[in-house]
């Protein structure tokens, strides 16, 4: 707690220090129109003292920006200066409080002199000064130039007819403003109804009554031209009846972003009567005025509006304060009640039917008791068959009240003036007319008084009842110079004249008339007095005094003329002198100097530095205004710069002295001396050009129009490639016809191929690229610059334009290379020669060179291999296949005629087999001399098969068997019946053929061998292995080299070649073991083209049966040598034995079925019976083997 109060005190001090007064005012500048009602808000915050703050408004006029002129205050009624006192007191300027710290300044009738810088000040209520106490903003007052006009008319329409009304809306406001236009309909005293409107944001809108019809297109608002707005209602309805007028508002955007309607105007109305197509009718009551004096007449008109009124029946009744006055039936005969019938009889009242739809009530002499409400009622009647009338619908309008005032026996005074607002220096004329009722002998005394803006009253001049004039004390001097005059024009009319008025003459002029009547005793006495006044506003000459410099041509072309206008506002009469001085600031300088001055007495004075302007400048002052025009001819750069005019306003005093009232400086007017507007047009047409290389590319650049016949042109030629971002310069020709090659021409070596030409017509330029290449393809275009000669005789570039593009495609000649596609096959024997032909049927150019390549696809090899190729210069080259297959010495190429190429392969071998074809490349020379491959084609394929000779080797197969005795020799001949080639060689080998296991039986005879072969056939069915054993006796190779002798016969063999086709092998000292089959095997060998021997085929002779007889005979040999004995002993017992076994098994099977019927059903396997397998040999005496396999017998 001890620390709390010090801290609280510190916070309080800090709060006081931190709070400071802040005054804010509406952000300016604000643009408002004359005669409008404006408001400017002002807020104050951060203050101390009472919550309700006071506000004081002041203005700083443009004529004296440093001098404060006080306007109005919420605290001090004497705060306003004299210039504003009258308007403040009259309520035309006042301050409206919004809150205690916020207020609005109201100016109800804004004047041009109200423009300036406004300051809102709040008197201090703080303990000390801290913060801001005032804020300023600018107000600009502009003329109200909005005009809304329409043709006033009355239209009679029938329901469903279309309606079109037009309204002209125009404004001359310099500032950026928006217009809103609305069409409204008004019926009598009802509030207007919006038909359709165009907002300032260009949005169409209608009220709820017309919204649906607008959405359906029944109601439209169209803008025609710049200022005409047309309303269209396509199908009128009875509810559309009324007065149509358009209302326009001009909006401007304030600095805070909000829009403000500166002024609103409405046009004259068009009354539209819509006649319904049904039985409806309307009634309205009209009278001229509602306030009357006793004795005056009044007329009431009851107007009926309906269709076909003559064919219908209506009755009318009149009422006064709900009491019946009179009735009138369809026969138009009035019937009045007793009170009004008496007045009607005296001619003071009349009830009549003026026309079919108009009924009148007239009272010729009103009484005071006639004050009240009047009305009429119209009832439609229907006539029956009997002629009687039945009332139908009845309608009555609103009551019209009138007031009848009693007569006053007094004088009345009327004051009139020649103008309510005059310009300072103009004459003021006032008339005071006295109207009397009776008292023809009365006299009047008149006093003219002036009540100024500060409500101070002063006597100007008075006339007593005896006709004596006397000026007021303040007007003695002016009256002596004739500046103030008063006159009695008629007995009841008095005038006051003030000549060469001044600003201080402004105020309320009052005519005070006193009526004097002579009494019985002859004395004059006042019986009454009346006052009347009129307000006169005198606009100071300097009010709204402004100077504006304008030019219709702020930008002029070389050598042209231009006018400068110095507009003086307002429009002063000729009596008000204004001197005008034109000043000039050349381009690039900071000081102005006087060109010429038009003095107030009409003289002309030239400035010290205007010598260059005198010969080319004309100055003229308008007779009807003080506007001064400066005309300068033959414009050049020296006349470019900023111009300004200075005006001085003078006033002539009543004593013939002069006073300079104000000086105004206009806006800066910058005149730019411009180059001429270009008319350059370059042809934009696009072209597509396709040509074959070595031709010429013709590019045209056409100037369709030019600014001047003296124009020169610089032409730049560009090419754009797809790979480049921008075009590249090829060639430039300047306006002086000089040539410059671009980087592209240098890089691509185009200098020697470019040719530029300007045609005689002058507007066509051509660029030719000779000997076009494929690399010259691209998008070509020209860039044209137009050059003119300035007034200072210097060339300048006026404009430039790019032409349309020419898409150039340079292509190589179309390929016409074509080879023969004939497919072929070729079969040859080894060592022969083959010929492969490649025929060129067509080619692109006779100047082309051909490269011919032969290749081959080998079997089981997917890739092709080059055999050889013939280059473009006719040089023969071997391919990789030639090295592989040793073709280098066997290939030969020739071309017997143009387009025919042959490849010869000599001494062919089997490995040369394959599918052969040729490929031809056609090469052409480019325009630069470089050869390039233009096309290639592949010919039809030729299948080549290289075969070895057919095998024709035959060995004698008919060889007799032989039987020799033991120790004797036997011969094995090998006879070759035919051979495949005379160059062949033979390899011969003799074999001993024995069955496996045959060694146990020893050697067999010929017959035994045959039986053994049958046995071998049976055994082959049971065993897939070869049962024969081959043993080489002797072999002789194709190179005549002997192989080793077989061991059983080693040393017992003798070889002989009896002839080239007969070979003999002799086996000496035969033994029984030599018994058996023998054969000879012959191989035929041939030499390949590479001189290598290969085996062509082989052949084997038939077996030769050799039987070597043993000197001792056995039982076995006896049985085996006798077939009948052999079958009896070894074959017949076996079938008998088999049948016996089968019979036993069948008997046993049946006995088991009878004892065990369900055994098979219980899963016990049935008896499987296999025949016994017997192994026996029909060629030997070994006993047969009986085999019974497992499971054969249970």
Swiss-Prot record:
Subcellular location(s) per record: Membrane
Pfam families: V-set
Positions glycosylated per UniProt: 43, 418, 842, 1077
Main location: membrane
Stretches with biased composition (Acidic residues): 1007-1026
Extracellular topological domain: 20-1124
Residue numbers spanned by region Disordered: 997-1030
Residues in Ig-like C2-type domain copies: 20-138, 143-262, 276-386, 401-539, 545-661, 676-803, 813-945, 949-1097
Organism, scientific name: Mus musculus
Keywords assigned by UniProt, alphabetized: Disulfide bond, Glycoprotein, Immunoglobulin domain, Membrane, Repeat, Signal, Transmembrane, Transmembrane helix
InterPro entries: Ig-like_dom, Ig-like_dom_sf, Ig-like_fold, Ig_sub, Ig_V-set, IgSF_V-set/TM_domain
Xref: Gene3D superfamilies: Immunoglobulins
Disulfide-bond pairs as recorded: 42-120, 167-246, 302-376, 432-511, 566-645, 701-782, 838-918, 974-1080
Membrane topology: Single-pass type I membrane protein
Signal peptide bounds: 1-19
Residues spanning the membrane: 1125-1145
PANTHER family the record matches: V-SET AND TRANSMEMBRANE DOMAIN-CONTAINING PROTEIN
One Gene Ontology cellular component: membrane
Cytoplasmic compartment spans: 1146-1194
Record motif EWI motif, residues: 250-252
Name of the protein in its database record: Immunoglobulin superfamily member 3
Tissue expression: Expressed in the lacrimal duct and lacrimal gland.
């Amino acid at each position: 707690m001890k620390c709390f109060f010090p801290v609280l005190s510190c916070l309080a001090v800090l709060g006081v220090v931190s709070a400071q007064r802040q005054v804010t005012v509406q952000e300016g500048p604000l643009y408002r129109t004359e005669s409008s009602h404006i408001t400017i808000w002002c807020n104050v915050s951060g203050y101390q003292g009472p919550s309700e703050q006071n506000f004081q408004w002041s203005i700083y006029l443009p004529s004296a920006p440093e001098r404060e002129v006080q306007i109005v205050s919420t605290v001090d009624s004497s705060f306003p200066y004299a210039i504003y006192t009258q308007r403040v007191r009259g309520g035309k300027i006042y301050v409206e409080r919004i809150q205690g710290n916020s207020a609005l300044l109201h100016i109800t009738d804004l004047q041009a002199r109200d423009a300036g810088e406004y300051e809102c000040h709040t008197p201090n209520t703080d303990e000390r000064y801290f913060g801001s106490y005032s804020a300023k903003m600018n107000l600009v007052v502009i003329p109200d130039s909005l005009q809304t006009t329409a043709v006033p008319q009355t239209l009679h329409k029938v329901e469903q007819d279309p309606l079109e009304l037009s309204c002209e809306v125009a404004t001359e406001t310099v500032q950026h403003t928006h217009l809103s236009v609305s069409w409204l309909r008004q019926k009598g005293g009802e509030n207007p109804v919006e038909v359709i409107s165009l907002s300032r944001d260009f949005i169409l809108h209608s009220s709820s009554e017309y919204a649906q019809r607008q959405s359906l297109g029944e109601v439209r608002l169209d803008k025609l031209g710049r200022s005409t707005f047309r309303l269209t209602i396509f199908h009128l309805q009875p509810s559309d009846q009324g007065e149509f007028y358009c209302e326009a508002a001009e909006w401007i955007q304030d600095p805070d972003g909000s829009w403000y309607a500166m002024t609103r105007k409405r046009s004259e109305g068009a009354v539209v009567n819509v006649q319904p197509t049904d039985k409806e009718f309307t009634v309205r009551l009209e009278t001229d005025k509602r306030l009357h004096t006793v004795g005056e007449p009044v007329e009431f008109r009851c107007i009926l509006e309906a269709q076909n009124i003559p064919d219908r029946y209506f009755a009318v009744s009149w009422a006064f304060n709900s009491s019946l006055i009179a009735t009138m039936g369809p026969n138009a005969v009035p019937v009045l009640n007793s009170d009004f019938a008496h007045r009607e009889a005296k001619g003071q009242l009349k009830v009549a039917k003026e026309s079919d739809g108009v009924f009148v009530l007239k009272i010729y002499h009103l009484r005071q008791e006639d004050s009240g409400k009047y009305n009429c009622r119209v009832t439609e009647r229907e006539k029956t068959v009997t002629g009687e009338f039945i009332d139908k619908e009845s309608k009555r309008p609103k009551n019209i009240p009138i007031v009848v005032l009693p007569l006053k026996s007094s004088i009345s005074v009327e004051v009139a003036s020649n103008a309510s607002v005059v310009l300072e220096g103009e004459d003021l004329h006032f008339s005071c007319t006295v109207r009397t009722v009776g008292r023809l002998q009365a006299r009047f005394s008149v006093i003219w008084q002036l009540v100024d803006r500060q409500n101070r009253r002063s006597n100007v001049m008075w006339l007593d009842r005896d006709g004596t004039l006397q000026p007021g004390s303040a007007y003695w001097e002016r009256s002596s110079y004739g500046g103030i005059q008063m006159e009695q024009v008629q007995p009841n009319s008095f005038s006051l004249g003030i000549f060469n008025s001044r600003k201080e003459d402004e105020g309320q002029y009052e005519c005070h008339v006193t009526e004097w009547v002579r009494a019985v005793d002859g004395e004059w006495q006042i019986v009454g007095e009346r006052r009347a006044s009129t307000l006169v506003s005198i606009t100071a000459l300097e009010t709204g005094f402004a100077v504006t410099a304008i030019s219709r041509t702020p930008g002029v072309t070389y050598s042209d003329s231009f006018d400068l206008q110095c507009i003086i506002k307002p429009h002063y009469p000729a009596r008000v002198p204004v001197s005008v001085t034109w000043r000039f600031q050349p381009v690039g300088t900071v000081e102005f100097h006087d060109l010429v001055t038009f003095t107030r007495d009409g003289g002309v004075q030239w400035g010290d530095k205007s010598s260059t302007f005198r010969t080319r400048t004309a100055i003229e002052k308008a007779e009807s205004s003080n506007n001064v025009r400066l005309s300068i001819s033959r414009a050049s750069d020296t006349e470019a710069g900023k111009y300004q005019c200075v005006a001085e306003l003078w006033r002539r005093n009543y004593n013939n002295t002069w006073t300079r009232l104000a000086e105004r400086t206009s806006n800066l007017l910058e005149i730019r001396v411009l180059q001429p507007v270009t008319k350059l047009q370059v042809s934009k047409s696009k072209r597509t050009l396709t040509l074959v290389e070595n031709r010429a590319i013709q590019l045209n650049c056409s100037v369709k129009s030019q600014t001047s016949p003296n124009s020169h042109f610089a032409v730049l030629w560009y090419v754009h490639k797809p790979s480049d971002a921008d075009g590249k310069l090829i060639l430039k020709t300047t306006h002086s016809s000089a040539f410059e090659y671009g980087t592209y021409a240098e890089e691509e070596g185009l200098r020697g191929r470019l040719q530029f030409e300007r045609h005689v017509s002058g507007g066509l330029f051509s660029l030719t690229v000779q000997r076009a290449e494929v690399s010259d393809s691209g998008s070509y275009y020209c860039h044209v610059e137009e050059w003119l000669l300035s007034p200072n005789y210097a060339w300048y570039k006026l404009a430039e334009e790019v032409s349309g593009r020419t898409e150039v495609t340079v292509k190589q000649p179309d390929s016409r290379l074509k080879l023969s596609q004939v497919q072929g096959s070729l079969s040859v024997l080894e060592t022969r020669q083959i010929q492969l032909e490649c025929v060129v049927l067509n080619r692109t150019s006779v100047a082309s060179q051909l490269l011919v390549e032969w290749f081959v696809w080998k079997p089981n090899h997917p890739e092709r291999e080059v055999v050889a190729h013939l280059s473009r210069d006719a040089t023969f080259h071997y391919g990789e296949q030639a090295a592989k297959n040793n073709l280098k010495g066997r290939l030969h190429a020739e071309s017997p005629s143009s387009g025919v190429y042959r490849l010869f392969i000599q001494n062919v071998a089997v490995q040369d087999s394959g599918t052969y074809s040729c490929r031809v490349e056609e090469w052409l020379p480019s325009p630069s001399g470089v050869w390039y491959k233009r096309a290639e084609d592949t010919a039809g394929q030729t299948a080549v098969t290289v075969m070895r000779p057919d095998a024709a080797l035959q060995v004698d197969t008919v060889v007799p068997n032989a039987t020799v005795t033991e120790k004797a020799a036997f011969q094995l001949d090998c006879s070759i019946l035919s051979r495949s080639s005379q160059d062949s060689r033979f390899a011969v080998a003799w074999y001993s053929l024995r069955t496996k296991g045959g060694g146990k039986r020893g050697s067999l005879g010929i017959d035994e061998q045959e039986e053994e072969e049958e046995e071998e056939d049976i055994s082959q069915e049971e065993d897939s292995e070869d049962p024969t054993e081959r043993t080489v006796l002797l072999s002789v190779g194709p190179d005549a080299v002997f192989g080793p002798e077989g061991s059983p016969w080693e040393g017992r063999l003798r070889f002989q070649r009896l002839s080239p086709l007969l070979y003999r092998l002799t086996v000496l000292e035969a033994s029984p073991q030599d018994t058996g089959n023998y054969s000879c095997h012959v191989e035929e060998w041939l030499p390949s083209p590479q001189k290598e021997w290969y085996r062509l085929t082989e052949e084997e002779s038939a077996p030769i049966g050799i039987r070597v007889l043993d000197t001792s005979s056995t039982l076995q040999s006896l049985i085996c040598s006798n077939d009948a004995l052999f079958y009896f002993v070894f074959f017949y017992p076996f079938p008998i034995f088999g049948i016996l076994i089968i019979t036993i098994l069948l008997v046993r099977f049946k006995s088991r079925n009878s004892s065990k019927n369900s055994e098979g059903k219980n899963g016990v396997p049935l008896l499987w019976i296999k025949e016994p397998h017997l192994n026996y040999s029909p060629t030997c005496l070994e006993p047969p083997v009986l085999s019974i396999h497992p499971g054969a017998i249970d």
